[in-house]
Structure formats: C-alpha cells, structure tokens
Amino acid sequence: MFAPLLKKLFGSKNEREIKRMLKTVSAVNALEEKMVALSDEQLRGKTAEFKERLAKGETLDQLLPEAFAVAREAGKRVMGMRHFDVQLIGGMTLHEGMIAEMRTGEGKTLVGTLAVYLNALSGKGVHVVTVNDYLARRDANWMRPLYEFLGLTVGIVSAFQPPEEKRAAYAADITYGTNNEFGFDYLRDNMAFSQDEKFQRELNFSVIDEVDSILIDEARTPLIISGQAEDSSKLYIEINRLIPRLTQHIEEVEGQVTQEGHYTIDEKSRQVELNEAGHQFIEDMLTQSGLLAEGESLYSAHNLGLLTHVYAGLRAHKLFHRNVEYIVQDGQILLIDEHTGRTMPGRRLSEGLHQAIEAKENLNIQAESQTLASTTFQNYFRLYTKLSGMTGTADTEAFEFAQIYNLNVMVIPPNKPLARKDFNDLVYLTADEKYAAIITDIKESMALGRPVLVGTATIETSEHMSNLLKKEGIDHKVLNAKYHEKEAEIIAQAGAPGALTIATNMAGRGTDILLGGNWEAEVAALDNPTPEQIAQIKADWQKRHQQVLEAGGLHVIASERHESRRIDNQLRGRAGRQGDAGSSRFYLSLEDSLMRIFASDRVKNFMKALGMQSGEAIEHRMVTNAIEKAQRKVEGRNFDIRKQLLEYDDVANEQRKVIYHMRNSLLAAQNIGDTIAEFRQEVLDATISQHIPPQSLPEQWDVAGLEASLASDFAMKLPIQQWLDEDDHLYEETLRERLIKEITDAYNEKEDQAGEDALRTFEKQILLRVLDDLWKDHLSTMDHLRHGIHLRGYAQKNPKQEYKRESFTLFQELLESIKRDTIRVLSHVQVRREDPAEEEARLRREAEELASRMQFQHAAAPGMESDLQASEEGAEVAVAAAPVRNDQKLGRNEPCWCGSGKKFKHCHGQIE
C-alpha cells in the first residue's frame, strides 16, 4: 500500500537511475565546445591518449565523459549525426552492463557506438552481436568510418569465412557478427588441435542488438556441432507409412469421449502422447511389418530407439505443419522462426524429428547426426566479462533478464514524445468476420493515403490475406519466409503513401519504415546518380513524407495476438518512430490459436451474454485484460521451461567448462610429460588395487587378472606369478614398486627410441584425440540421460537431483576413462620416426576431413514440456541450485564446488 506513495516521493528505480546519469550527461555536454575546437588529428589522437591513461591506472568510468564527448564529436564530423542526451544515457546503460530499451527509430545503432568505443580502448575486444548476417554487415559498414576515424579497427565474422580472414576479424578492436557465428566459433575453438587454429580471444564485452530475440526467444535452442551417425532412413520411411493409420482420441471438457483413438494432442504444451490403445495398435503394426519381434514390447530396453522413431513420426505429422512451422524449398525442410517469420537455413531439429518431417514430405532423408560439441546461448553469453544489450521491447521480460543473466533493464526516455494511437482490440466470433473487418480498415486507411502494415503470425495467414486482397483488386507486397531475399527492399518502401505490406510477425526487424519511403534506397537503385537527380529524389520524398504525416502516419494492423506481449509490442513499434504520427489495431477472433487455447471460454461467455450477432465485434477493456492474462500465463510457462532448460544445462555446462579448461591448458602446454606420468601412476595404482586390494592376504589376490589387465592397458606381459613363486619376500608394496619400475622403464625406453620432443608432441595429440572422442560419447550419454530423466518423477524422485547425481557419476567415469585410454594408446603405440612436418600435415588433413563432415545446427529443445510436467508430478523435493563455481581458488582438501560432497582433490581437482 505504501509502494505508490514511495514511488511518488522518490520516483521509480528507472527514474532514479536516469536522474543519476543526467549528471554525467551534463559533464559530457560541458566538454562539447572543447571537442569542437580540436582538429581532426587532435580528435583522433585522443584515442591513443585514453589508452595511455588506462595503462597508467585510470578506469573506463573515469574516462567516460571525455570519451563520450570525443565519440559524439566524431559522429558529427564523420556521420553527420550528433548523439542526443537520451542517447548518451543509452550509451552509459550499455557500458554499465545493462539492457537499454529504446523505442523504434531512437537510434540504437548510434547509441551502441558510445559504449563500444569506450570499451574498445581496453584493447581486449568488443563483440557487437546482431540477429542476422545482413544486419551485422550493414551496421559494421555503416559505423566503420566513425571507428576508423578514431583509430580503431573493425572486423566482421560470418559463416564460410576463410580462417585467416576470420582470425583477423576477431583480432580487431570491434567485431560484428551474429549470435550463431560467435557461439559456433566458441565451440570450434574448443575442438582446435593447436593454439594457432583458434579464433576468439577472451570474451570481454558484448553489445547484443535485439537482445530479447537472442537471449529470450533463442534461449531454448542449443547450438550443436555434429557429425554424421549411422543411416536409418529406411526406418523413417517405414514408420511414416504407419502414422497416418493412427486416429486422434478426443474428449470434451466434461470428460465425455467424442472420438475413440490412439493418441491425444495437448496444444498448450505442444505434446502428442500415445494412449494404451495406441501403444497396442502401433506394436501390432510394427510386428506385422517386421520391425518388432513377435511378443516383444516397445518399452523393452533395446526397443527404445524404435519408440523414439514412432514419437518423432507422430510429432512430425500432428504438430508440424507445412507453411506454418516449416516450408519445403529446393527439396529441403526449412524451419520457420516463430518470432520473426524468417526461415532458418541449416537449422535442424534433433531426436530424429527433422528426418521424420523429411519422410512425411517424401524428401531425401539426410543422415542423423551425433553431437561433437554443444552449448546454449544462455551459457555462452554468460561467459562474457560484461554483457549488455539494446532492444525496443525488454521491459515485459525484465524479471527473466535479471534472474537468468543478472541484467537490469533501463527504459530510455524517447527524444520526442510518442504520438502513436493504440486502439483497443476488436474481437469477432469467426476468422472470416475478422478478415472482412481487416480489409475494410485497409481500404479506409489507403483511401486517406496512409501506408498500412499488416502483421500475421504465420505464412499461411499472410498468404490467405494476400489472396483476399487480390480478389478485392488491392495492390500489396508480401513479406514472409518465402520471400526473404526481398525483405530489405520491401520494408524500405513500406512507408510510401498508400503502400500496403503484409509481413509475417516481425520480419524486417532492424530496418526502420520511413514515412514517405526510403529515398536512399531510390538513390542506390540508380547507376551513378547526378547531384541533381539526388536533390530531386530528396525533394520528392519530402513531399511524400509530409503527405503521409498529414494523413495520420503508418497504420499497423495485426491479424491476431502473439503468445508474447513483447512480440505484439514490437509490431506496434513499427509505427510512430521518432515522434511521428501513427496508429495500431489488433483484430482477433475466437478461432485464433491464442484465444481458442487459452482465453476463449471467458470471452465467449461474455460475448454470448451481450447477445452478439454475426459480423459484430466486441471492443471492451475486459476482453483485452483477459487476453493479456492469457499471454502472461503463456509467458510464465515459457519462462519456466527456459529456466528448467538452464538448470539442466548448468550441470552439463560445469562439465563443459572443466573439459574446455583442460583442453586449453593442453594446447598451451609445451610439455605434458609430467601429466602423462601422473596419469600412468594413477592408472597403474587403480589397476593393481583392483586385483590386489590394499592390506589383503595373498590368497585374495587375482594375479591372473592383474597380468591380463597389464597386458591390455600397458602392453606389458609380465610374469607376476613366476616372480611371486621365486621370491617369498615379494609382498604387496614391493610388488607395486617393481611393477611401477618395469612399466616406467619400458616407457622411458620408448622415449629414447622416438626422441623426447617427438614423444611429447605425440602425447599431446593422443591426449587431445582421446579427450575429444570420449567427450563426444559423454555428450551422447548425457543426451540419453537427459531425455529419460523425467520418468524418475513417477518413482517419487526429483528428476533434477537424479540428473545431477547421475551426470556427476558419468563425469567421474569420463575423467578416469580419459586417463586410462590415453595410457593404453601410448603404451601400445609402435615407435616409428616421422618427420615433424609430415606429422603436422597429416594431423591437419585429418582435422580438415573431420570439419568437412561436421554440421552446425540448432537443435530444438525437445521434450522440455513433458519434462516440466513430469517433474511437477514427481516428489515434492526441495531442488538444490545447480552447481556454480566461483573464481576463488579452492584448497585441495575443501569440499568440491560441484556439490558432490567429495574433497576437491578427489573430484574436479584431479584434472586441474
């Protein structure tokens, strides 16, 4: 009850932060005259001066006012653009590691230059992250003259870039690229066989453009580098033939069965489940087709792979629809980003789902893949020392940014007040009535000379709208995943008088819609335009611009509400940029997905109570509130799913960091002889203890087993039984010493034959190979564990705790296997002198061959919904936080940071 009063007295946290920053803005403004008086050379020289002052102990915070003043003056001279005061606040927000929410058209790209310039002075590199290659290249080339004027270098990273070019881009002061490329390069670096092959430096400071798209929308999507696994395309084809014979089981709300069937669909969680009748039916069909042995169950351990194929086929047919979740282009399945409407070339669904869709569409089925390396955007971006971001819509997700990334959101006030009118939603009974109303609104707006942007949620809807408009004879442009190449061109002219554009969701995001059209695009379309032509184009544009403003600006029409309020706000934000006039209106029907699944009953009852007739619309605050409540419910559920994904991945991430740290230490080490000697000692001790338990009687010794193990692991055929028979004084400790001496001498002899330098190089390469192979297998094992762990909930066990416990056991086994397999390979190897240059060339050829077979993909985050549900149904056990390691150095006898309960030296300290 006191919160509103306190807010009135002291202002909101956002207002207090802005008030604090305004003092620094005044300091920057006070330096403006001084900067204006400097020559270009003197202004450029400020960069070297700042670097020198940093080296002498000054901080970036102390340099900020002067550095911002320098960047502002450079912007005026090079770009013809001066940073507004609110843009200075935006720059400070980014520098302080926060998210700046700025409305469309407020100059986010220019704001970024302030924080980027300041942080690039440290020489540690700055990464500017965008959602696609087009924006990365556009922004880098747009701002390059400014940075180069100030003496900084700019690089761009992209897919299929030559290694040397990419390495140079990362070495630049400022590097632009997409979130995908930065993430994949991180994974590639941790698969490199030498330091020279690595691309990235330390992850210092990152500015993420459209941060909500990358850290929220993409958060559930793992980045995966994979290699081909065994071919099972015939199985997908067989399963695909069986799926259409299954029927859906449907029940009404009261539980009355209206259609007996084999499976149920939960639209809220996007899950499909076989019921008992379905399991029996599918088992019978699989038995008849010879895929399942007579009398066997699908749930037998050796048939679980077959069950996975069945569910993949079921999901492909019942949850994935052509032109909604994917399109077919050039014989390939291209997934559609539900948030932007863009296709995602190269991205494949995991767990055989992509292959199942290929079988459904009668396409060539590509081989399944095996994970070689993986991470998530959540974990990758948390590796940066400082993280920041910009977007037009972050405030609705402020809680998630704070919880997951420790990022606060600052709402930056606009330079000019918002003049856009946001009309109440109109809700109709049927979709046909809704579309008719949209066309009426379009006609009225176009008659006034206003440009109109119609936002749709799917390609299917955009094409349906297009067909309706064609019947009416209304000229329009369609922007969706099918016409991705024309995106920038269509968006550029979407603000022309009377222009009508249909866009799937937020396709074209990152490009402003300028009222009157884009005169620069018109100039660019001409070959060698004269100054007179350019002047004429600008004059014509000015007239059109004024004409559109007087008509009321851009009118945004949405054909339905999205699950997320943020996506709705992004669509609205296309109108009313920089204080321009504009308006928005959402048209809904009870047949829309969101309304049908989440909000229909309450609204339907309300509409019935009003006695609404066909063609009538309801425009009421209660309806809008009901819809927003439904959206909040979906947002909350999606947040829980993303949070749960992170909790599971945090376990894998700690293991990933340990393995990658070990790998990087290996690459940096010149000599790992001592490490190999330690491994040999530990493996030998474990082998001896396994067959000759400590403090045991000779009668309890398994001498034959020890001889066999030494022959297997160390390639040493030692007559241990003969030694014992000949020497009565040979007891446990002296036997252990003799075995160590024999094996060490044999290895030293091998070193003498090969040469110390050659063997050290060979040891490093073997350890890297063993580590990579076992890590790859470990990832596969972790995947299997992860996808089945939710079933523990039915046994009244907490799935997260079980996953954490079992994954730790698996990791301990991995560490032991790395040591044992490395020693086994080194012990069995036959010494053959090879020219070092030939050896290096051979290894490089093998690495290139491996790289050629790799796939860089995003897997879906499959099964998260069912996992979430199962864990809720399981035991009510308090879930411990996922293990987080701080930077403090642990003593070897202290409890390990991972939460295993073991001492550090017996746990993760073993490999550090």
Curated annotation (Swiss-Prot):
Any one GO MF term held by the record is: ATP binding
Species this protein is from: Pseudomonas entomophila (strain L48)
Alphabetically ordered keywords of this record: ATP-binding, Cell inner membrane, Cell membrane, Cytoplasm, Membrane, Metal-binding, Nucleotide-binding, Protein transport, Translocase, Translocation, Transport, Zinc
Membrane-related topology note: Peripheral membrane protein
In its UniProt entry, what is this protein called?
Protein translocase subunit SecA
Co-factor(s):
Zn(2+)
Q: What Gene Ontology cellular-component terms does the record carry?
A: cell envelope Sec protein transport complex; cytosol; plasma membrane
Assign the protein's first listed, main location to one coarse class.
membrane
